Amino acid sequence: RDIRFDLNRIEGYRNFCNKLWNAARFVTLNTENIAHNSNPSPQESLLLPDLWIQSKLHLLLQSIEKNIKIYRIDLVANSLYEFVWNDFCDWYLELTKSILYSTDHFSDDNKKQTKVNLLNVLDKVLRALHPIIPFITEEIWKSFNFVSSKRSIMVSSYPKKESLCYDKITIHKIEWMQSFVTNIRQIRSEMNIAPKVQIPILLQDASEGDLNLLNETSVFIKDMANVYEIKTITDAPPLSAISLLGGMKILIPLAGLIDIESERKRLEKKLIQIQNNLSSVNQRLENKNFKSKAPKDVVENLVSQSELLSQDKIKIERQIEMMSLS
C-alpha cells in the first residue's frame, strides 16, 4: 500500500528523539555517583514510582515479544513511542524529582535506590529502542558514557521482562494518582488558574480506598499538581470548581484565585459566540441542497467544525455550571 510522507509525523519523531536525549541527560546528571552496573533493589524495597515503571516496562517488553513473533514491527514502534513519551518521560521522570529533590520525605537510601532504578530502566529502554532508532540510541549510549560492559549498544543483549519486577496493584495506584493530577490540571486550564499558583484541594465523598491511595501518593500529587494542602470535608463546600474521580469529588475553592463574577461574564459572552457559530454551521449541514452540491472535503470540514464547536460549548457550559456549584 502507499504510505503518505507526512512532514508533521517527521517533526513529531524529531521531537521524540529530542525528548529521549533530554531524558538521558536528566538521568545522567542525577546519577553521577552511581555505578552503571549497580544491582537493582528487590521488589519489596522499591518506592512506588520505581516499582510502577518497572511494571510498565515489564508489560511493554512482553508486548514487544508477542508482536515481533507476528512481524508487527509497527505495533512494536508505537508501543515504544507511547511508553517513552508518556510513562517514562512525562510521568516517571517527574515523579523521581519528588524523590531526588526532597528535603524531608525520602531518605538518602531511598534516593540512591531511585537513582539505580533510573539508570537500569534507561539502559533497558535504550536497548529496546535500538533496533527501531539505532543512530540516536548509539549516540546517547556513547555521549553520556552509558557503558556497562559493552562498548557499543549494538552488541548488548535485548532486555528481558524477567529482569524486571511486576506488580499489578502498583499500576492501579499510580493510575489513580495520574487521574487525580490530570483532573486538577484540567480544572486549572478550564478556570484559567496559572500552573505556578499553589492551590488547596478539598475532597468530598472519599471512600476508604480513596483515602488509602491518597495516603500513599499525596507527596507526588502535591508536587505534580502544585498543591499545598489536601483536606477531606463533610460540610457544604465553599464555591469551588469540581471534578469527579470515581465517586469522590475533587474541589478547588475559587475564592482568591479568580474574579468569579468577571470570569462568569466572560464565559457567558464566549458561550453566545460559540452557540451562534454552531447554529450557522449546523444550518449549512442541514441544507440538503448544500450537502448534495458542495465538495466532499468542504462538507467534512464543516462536520469537523460542528463537532469541535459542540465540544467547546459543553466545556464552557461546564465551566459556568462549576461557578454556581457550592
PLM regions with names:
Residues 1:
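Gly/Pro-rich active-site capping loops and adjacent beta-alpha segments
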Residues 4, 8-326:
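Feature 926 captures the class I aminoacyl-tRNA synthetase adenylation module centered on the KMSKS loop
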